[in-house]
């Protein structure tokens, strides 16, 4: 959003089953209202999954992009990397990636080799990209592009802020805990939510009971997912007997302000 004054964006907008699949969504007006950029150009092409070769070829023909930018695990884009030679004749491939831990994933080498620009969201990622490519770095560009949040939207608040206090009272039904852990993501296996819940249980066990009873773990995610696990069962197994109020599920869609609270 906040690069709309530098770039025109066309996004293949994926979802498991996108309700707007097949449409072309023009976001220019909403981006202008959000950023004040009066000539913003942001377009979405909703698809199921992560797209495919046919839609990319059509976008290249219709939109004539100057570059292609990828985000997330490269294995979701094997279809695109299989088109590498076709694409890179005229359009560079750029990849905003993260790999946080060693050993360096040598099995990613073919993906990295298919990119003209590798942007790491941590300095360690940049180093790992270079280690994997080794002597095959060629003339690729490596950049450190750190993750960030819009500080106008996500910021510290005065504990006495009226709306903040009202939200907490409503959210916790007037029984506001002293310590809160907040999880906000999808219920999928790689997020390892049950492991985090077990760690929270260990944390509670390390506290006096009266202190532990004033702590809460808020899970803003699906309770049950085919792509993850049954978190209600995990809660029942780890918490219900000793800490029945320690886990709170949140399913309602939250506004940006509410997420900041």
Report the location of each language-model feature.
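Nucleotide-activated donor-binding/catalytic signature segment of Leloir-type glycosyltransferases, i.e.
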Residues: 43, 85-86, 214, 219-223, ...
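Short hydrophobic "strand-cap" motifs at the C-terminus of beta-strands
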Residues: 96, 121, 183-185, 220-222, ...
């Amino acid at each position: 959003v906040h690069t709309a004054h530098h770039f025109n964006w066309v996004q293949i907008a994926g979802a498991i089953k996108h309700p707007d699949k097949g449409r072309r969504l023009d976001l220019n007006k909403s981006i202008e209202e959000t950023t004040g950029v009066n000539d913003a150009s942001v377009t979405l092409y909703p698809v199921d999954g992560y797209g495919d070769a046919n839609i990319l070829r059509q976008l290249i023909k219709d939109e004539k992009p100057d570059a292609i930018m990828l985000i997330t695990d490269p294995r979701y884009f094997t279809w695109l990397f299989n088109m590498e030679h076709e694409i890179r004749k005229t359009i560079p491939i750029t990849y905003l990636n993260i790999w946080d831990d060693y050993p360096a994933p040598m099995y990613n080498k073919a993906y990295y080799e298919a990119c003209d620009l590798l942007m790491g969201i941590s300095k360690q990622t940049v180093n790992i990209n270079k280690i994997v490519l080794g002597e095959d770095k060629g003339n690729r560009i490596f950049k450190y592009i750190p993750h960030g949040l819009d500080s106008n939207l996500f910021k510290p608040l005065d504990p006495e802020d009226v709306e903040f206090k009202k939200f907490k009272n409503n959210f916790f039904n007037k029984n506001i805990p002293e310590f809160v852990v907040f999880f906000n993501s999808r219920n999928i296996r790689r997020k390892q939510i049950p492991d985090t819940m077990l760690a929270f249980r260990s944390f509670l066990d390390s506290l006096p009971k009266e202190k532990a009873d004033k702590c809460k773990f808020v899970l803003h995610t699906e309770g049950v997912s085919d792509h993850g696990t049954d978190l209600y069962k995990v809660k029942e197994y780890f918490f219900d007997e000793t800490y029945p109020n320690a886990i709170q599920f949140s399913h309602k869609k939250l506004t940006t302000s509410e997420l900041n609270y």
